[in-house]
Amino acid sequence: MLGPVNARTPVADGISAPYAKYFRSRPHHPNRSTAWGGRIAHNAAMLTRLPPHVRTFRRAAPRRAWRLAVLAPVLTLLAGCGSAGYYWQSVHGHLSLMQAARPVDELLADPAVAGDLKARLALARGMRAFAVSDLALPDNASYHRYSDLKRRAAVWNVSAAPPDSLELRRWCFPVVGCVGYRGYYDEAEAQALAARLARDEGLEVRVYGIPAYSTLGWLNWAGGDPLLSTFIRYPDGELARMIFHELAHQVVYVDDDTMFNESYATAVERLGVQRWLATQAGDAARRDYAAFDGRRQAFRELSRQTRRELEQVYAPKPALAHDQKALYAMKDEAMARFRQRYAQLKADWAAAGTPFNGYDAWVAGANNAFFGIQAAYDELVPGFEALFAQVGGDWPRFHAAVRELARLDTGQRQARLRALAGGSAVKS
């Protein structure tokens, strides 16, 4: 995900809850540095390039002096775009993440590093190599280092939508344009923004942790995106998905079109992990991935069905134009059906001997912001998958075709992808 992020797809997948067990063994030390406005820190950092002697970040000195020297002009440039404090803390938060990074090769050679972490790092290194050789993803500085963040998420995103629409509130930033989320390194700051949006603007809000984000390749000169403790212990197939998704953001990224960007990266991760599992993974990893992905697709379909129902409720209807009570009653009915269907889905999983409650928190707090986030990650995936089939599964041709789509305006891009998918995005 630009995430993301999260993101990445973690939001659409409900990944925070299903993978909570991978975080519980790790102490939480809140990082008071705040704010990642979507993919914002990279925009600030790229505006002023650091000299080679500070490229590792960890050994540069005096640290405070060079940070101020580099970031002061950046903040001046950004002041006209929004809160200087927000951007300052965005840059500080990302620098803290970069300072914590150590080369993977160094960690693998360090006898003090735990064997289980070494195994995950070695696996991730192989996945990155596979992404380059088999998926035509970029071979650059990203994922050659590892950062132990000592917290459960890389950033916390805030999304918001009106009570009668799935259209996400958008925040606009330099270089990346406008996105449907605003991110923070400190969860308390994210919750505070969400509370203000709900109180002052009457919006429905969602705060969610993101395990990874992409700097879109702009910071390869400074070491690229590191592997993070927030996702390194994911099951094999999920770890591969994360790496493939974030690298895809470095191939194609279109300003002001979150749905296009995230759907493309989601298609890359899905298609890529299928190939990785078929050629690189063992039977156990394939079984585990099939089980989890089956649940994920069932939950996505359930969410997609409810989105369609809510879109019909919110569509302009003269009879409801002045009857908010009727509109909200229909909305409540759609939400109730969503929760009833989810309860049945859980019962089916339990009956099949694979009980799972990883989506419970998402369902309990489901609102317009939740469904708006979901749409960003999967709405156009079928079109991208159809495009991949159209080019014969040739990865370089696929990426080139996506670059051509990126040259079109938003409406044309979406129309082409929906046509490729057969007229509507109903399956991923």
Summary of predicted features, one role per range:
Residues 7, 14-20, 29-30, 43-44, ...:
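Short hydrophobic alpha-helical segments enriched in small aliphatic residues
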Residues 47-70:
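Bacterial N-terminal signal peptides that target proteins for export
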Residues 97, 110, 117-124, 183-187, ...:
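Solvent-exposed, acidic/flexible segments
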